[in-house]
Amino acid sequence: MSDTQHQVNVRVDTRYLPEQSAPEQNRFAFAYTVTIENQGEVPAQLLSRHWIITDGDGRTQEVRGAGVVGEQPLIAPGAQHTYTSGTVLATRVGSMRGSYQMLGSDGIAFDAAIPVFRLAVPGALH
């Protein structure tokens, strides 16, 4: 069954932050810019987030919290919300995935999937 009222697309761009990293201390900092597009038929508010962060050694960390960067944006149909945040890994490569918990203006709660994306120091992947 397709729910055309509640469709959210999530895109992520990443970059390595050498100025905030300390490779000799196994500290690799990354920024990620997320674009959340409401492709549904009703306004939707982002209430909370759930991230699963995995480093290159397979260690995982789960992060849950209200909103994103201090906001719980209401996204109109056809509109986008973009924000930038960051994370630090102990390895040169890793990945993130997760979901946003959304609430449609019709009172229906739903999850918007965040597809897995890679974090990698330039040249770390062949």
Curated annotation (Swiss-Prot):
Domain annotation ApaG: ranges: 2-126
GO terms classed as biological process: error-free translesion synthesis
Top-level taxon of origin: Bacteria
Pfam families in the record: DUF525
Disulfide bonds: none
Name this polypeptide is given: Protein ApaG
Organism this protein belongs to: Pseudomonas aeruginosa (strain ATCC 15692 / DSM 22644 / CIP 104116 / JCM 14847 / LMG 12228 / 1C / PRS 101 / PAO1)
